Regions:
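C-terminal functional module detector
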Residues: 41, 45, 105-111, 115-260
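Short, glycine/serine-rich, charged loops/turns that create anion-binding
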Residues: 16, 55, 196
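Alpha-helical scaffolding within the catalytic cores
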Residues: 54-66, 97
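Short, solvent-exposed loop/turn segments at secondary-structure junctions
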Residues: 56-59, 85, 200
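A metal-dependent hydrolase metal-coordination microenvironment
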Residues: 1-51, 71, 78-99, 112-120, ...
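A general structural signal for stabilizing positions within well-ordered secondary structure
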Residues: 67-70, 103
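Short, glycine/charged-enriched secondary-structure capping and boundary segments
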Residues: 62-65, 90, 126-127
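A short helix-to-beta-strand connector/capping loop
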Residues: 71-72, 107
C-alpha cells in the first residue's frame, strides 16, 4: 500500500478488502490518513510491514517520508531486492540501524525481506519461517512472533538453546544462550546485543555462547567485506517490554540515522 510513493507498506493477514478511499479525506495530512488506515488494518487482525524505509536514491525515492507512529509496525523490511547484486547496500544497512533503535526502545518489531520484483529476480532475498504446521494461519502467527530469518544465501542451519532448552529466533529467553549458525558461504558473522557488536566471526558458521539479561535482545547478521547484508536472524530477547520507549514516531529514528 502506498499513498504517493513516499512510503510503502505491506499488510499481512487481511480477510477483507479495505476501502481506502472511504478512510481518506481530501486535504488531510498523510499521517492522519495512514493512521486511519492502520487502525482499520489492526481492527480486522492484520499486520503491518514498513518496506525499504531508507531507499531514497535519485531514481527511486521510495523511503518513508511521513512521521507515522511506531506502535503500528509489526515488521521492518531490512533487505529489499533493489539492493541486490551490490546495488545500494547502504539502504539496507540503514534499515538495520533502525531495527536496532526500535528494539533498544522496547519495540518488538521483527526483520523481514522482500524481493519486491519489478523486473528483477524473484526470491532474492527470502524469508524462512519455522512452522509447527503448514497452514496460512500458522504461517501468519509464526511470522508475527518473529520465528523467522532473512537470507540471500539459502536456508541456514540454526541451533539455539537457552539453559539447555531448544528455542528459536523471536522467542523470550533468560540467561545463558548457546547458538550455532551455519551457512553455505564464508561471510562475516556478527553477534549484536542492544545495538552493539559483541562478537565477530569470519567463515561459514558461528558458534557462540552469550548471556541475555533483562531488557536485552540479541541477534545475528552476516555481511561480506563490503558490508552488504546476506542474512539477518531475528532477535531473541529478555523482558524488553519493560523498556520505556524514548521514541514514539518515525522521524525520531529517521533524523537520528540520517545525521550519522
Amino acid at each position: 500500500m502506498t499513498l504517493d510513493d513516499l512510503g510503502h507498506f505491506n499488510f499481512f493477514g487481511l480477510k477483507e478488502f479495505i476501502d481506502y478511499y472511504s478512510l481518506v479525506e481530501e486535504g488531510e495530512k498523510k499521517e492522519e490518513s495512514l493512521r486511519k488506515i492502520f487502525d482499520r488494518v489492526k481492527e480486522i487482525g492484520g499486520y503491518i510491514s514498513l518496506n525499504h524505509p531508507f531507499h531514497n536514491s535519485r531514481k527511486m525515492p521510495l523511503g518513508l517520508m511521513y512521521d507515522i507512529e511506531l506502535k503500528y509496525l509489526d515488521f521492518l523490511e531490512v533487505i529489499n531486492s533493489p539492493t541486490s547484486n551490490g546495488r545500494n547496500p547502504y539502504y539496507d544497512k540503514k534499515a538495520l540501524e533502525a531495527l536496532d533503535i526500535l528494539w533498544c526502545n522496547g519495540y518488538k518489531i521483527f526483520a523481514v525481506s522482500g524481493s519486491d520484483n519489478h523486473g528483477m529476480i524473484i526470491g532474492d532475498p527470502l524469508n524462512y519461517v519455522k512452522l509447527d504446521e503448514y497452514s496460512t494461519k500458522n504461517i501468519l502467527e509464526t511470522f508475527k512472533k518473529g520465528r523467522c530469518y532473512v537470507s540471500r544465501i539459502g536456508e541456514l542451519e540454526l541451533e539455539y538453546k537457552n539453559n539447555g532448552r531448544v528455542v528459536y529466533p523471536g522467542e523470550e529467553v533468560e540467561g545463558k544462550v548457546e547458538i550455532k549458525v551455519r551457512g553455505k558461504e564464508n561471510l562475516i558473522w556478527k553477534v549484536i546485543k542492544n545495538n552493539k557488536v559483541i562478537e565477530t566471526v569470519i567463515g561459514n558458521e558461528i558458534i557462540t555462547e552469550q548471556v541475555v539479561n533483562e531488557k536485552e535482545y540479541l541477534r545475528i547478521e552476516a555481511t561480506d567485506i563490503e558490508h552488504e547484508i546476506f542474512a539477518v536472524i531475528n532477535p531473541i530477547y529478555n523482558s524488553i517490554e519493560k523498556i520505556e520507549p524514548q521514541i514514539k514516531r518515525w522521524f525520531e529514528i529517521k533524523d537520528s540515522i540520517w545525521r550519522e
